[in-house]
């Protein structure tokens, strides 16, 4: 998936997360995480972001996260929404690829 514009999703309310994405200049994803629970869950947040980016085969992108204690499912949903808003086709390929499809 190619990111062509900046996009964001989420709020700064308690138990939510604001995710902003933009095309990256370098060869790797650039993850910038600010979280009220970073000491406890910083690595889990990073892994969730990387899993979603890998699942959708996103080209190098900058992801800025301002977390206020959001659950994993909220983080995933906010990132998926930001990806949809930033990509050129306007929709995500939901579900896993079906290898047996003809």
Curated annotation (Swiss-Prot):
O-(phosphoribosyl dephospho-coenzyme A)serine PTM positions: 14
Functional note: Covalent carrier of the coenzyme of citrate lyase.
Record lineage: Bacteria, Pseudomonadati, Pseudomonadota, Gammaproteobacteria, Enterobacterales
Subunit text: Oligomer with a subunit composition of (alpha,beta,gamma)6.
Keywords: Cytoplasm, Phosphoprotein
NCBIfam families from the UniProt entry: citD, PRK13253.1
UniProt key word DNA-binding: no
Highest taxon above the source species: Bacteria
Recorded family membership: Belongs to the CitD family.
Annotated localization: Cytoplasm
Signal peptide per UniProt: none
Protein name: Citrate lyase acyl carrier protein
Gene encoding the protein: citD
GO cellular component: cytoplasm
């Amino acid at each position: 998936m190619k990111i062509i514009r900046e996009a964001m999703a989420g709020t700064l309310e308690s138990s939510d997360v604001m995710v902003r994405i933009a095309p990256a200049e370098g060869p790797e994803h650039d993850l910038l995480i600010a979280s009220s629970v970073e000491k406890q869950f910083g690595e889990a947040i990073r892994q969730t972001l990387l899993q979603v980016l890998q699942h959708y085969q996103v080209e190098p992108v900058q992801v800025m996260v301002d977390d206020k204690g959001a659950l994993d499912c909220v983080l995933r949903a906010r990132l998926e929404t930001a990806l949809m808003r930033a990509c050129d086709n306007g929709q995500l390929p939901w579900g896993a690829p079906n290898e047996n499809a003809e």
